[in-house]
Amino acid sequence: MIVNYFFLLIILLISIVSPLSGNSISGSILASKYSSSINDFQKSADFNLKILESGIDDPAFYNDALLYLVASGNFNASFKLSKKMFDLDIRSPALGLVMIIEKISKEKINESISLVNLFEKDLPPVLVASIRGWMNLKKGKLEDSLYEFKKLSDTDLNFDLGAYYSAIAYSKFSKNEEALKIINKNNDNFKLLGKNFEILKSEIMIMNGESFKVLETLKKSISDFLNDITLKELYHKI
């Protein structure tokens, strides 16, 4: 399950950096406000795509459509749209991120790194360091990965993303004691991630041979999260 956290954390990063790109959403967001207010991002994406199909070739509408496709989870459509945007010489943080995610999903690590370098000026530093860190981790370069993640701990983010990523990095190299040291030090801060953090912590404790201790931890977590089914299933598997 730990390997799946990369994409969850990329979405987390989108939510962190999107307020930093206030001009990335055009006036079309007003016309599709109702759709997005009920979390129907696909309708908002379709709205912008229809505008483009009508002959309007404004980069802002391309960017809006791309953002809404990502928000709706329609990554295949977002990958297709990103190729068209790139060919039209449209550049934006959202485009760079989508193209990078596509290469990552296809395990094309070197191409992913090349895209990070290409879009570095368009992307927030926190995102660049995050992706480079994960790419180094994917290539088996733990120290290089930790170096990039350390940059995240030196930012003004309220959540220590660098420490969280570092804990996951250590666990992927079976250095579970190091991972738990970070988790225990930042436990209160990491709890902001809710049950996803509790699951991660439990899995690392299990890998570190602390099955009895993790049962006690999960009991409390199950109580805190009102008998969450996922946590209960994990508890009964131990």
Regions found by a protein language model. Give the residues of each.
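Bacterial N-terminal signal peptides
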Residues: 5-16
